[in-house]
Amino acid sequence: MAPLQLLHPWGRRGAWASQHSLLSQEAMGPGEGAEPTPWGYLRAEHWGASPSGAPTLPFAPDECSLTPGSPPHPLNKQKHHPPHPSQTQKDLVPRSPQLEKSRIRLRRTLRNLGGGRGQRGQ
């Protein structure tokens, strides 16, 4: 990739982050030797100088950009689980009387233990 100073719109060479491991005084902002530009003082975040010194593009599309062809985020996959093959709606319909009986049994058990809505003696 081209050095950062070649991407400067005015063609001037200066002390850039790509030439030194620490950011230069000119790139850091209004201090002694700061270089004013039409938009203010040169700063590393405006020019996209990375800590390693490689230039980065401020408006470059990243991996998380929302485009129609992009795959869904891995966290979104966890929210929408397909139904388990043994528990589909077709399987639940013939078992509904059995499920109703188990619900009644559970309700009685909760009542006996003091839980549930149907508490007596209040």
Swiss-Prot record:
Compositionally biased intervals (Gly residues): 113-122
Region entry Disordered, spans: 21-122
Other remarks on this protein: Oriented in a head-to-head manner with TLX1/HOX11. Both genes share the same promoter with robust bidirectional activity.
Protein known as: Putative TLX1 neighbor protein
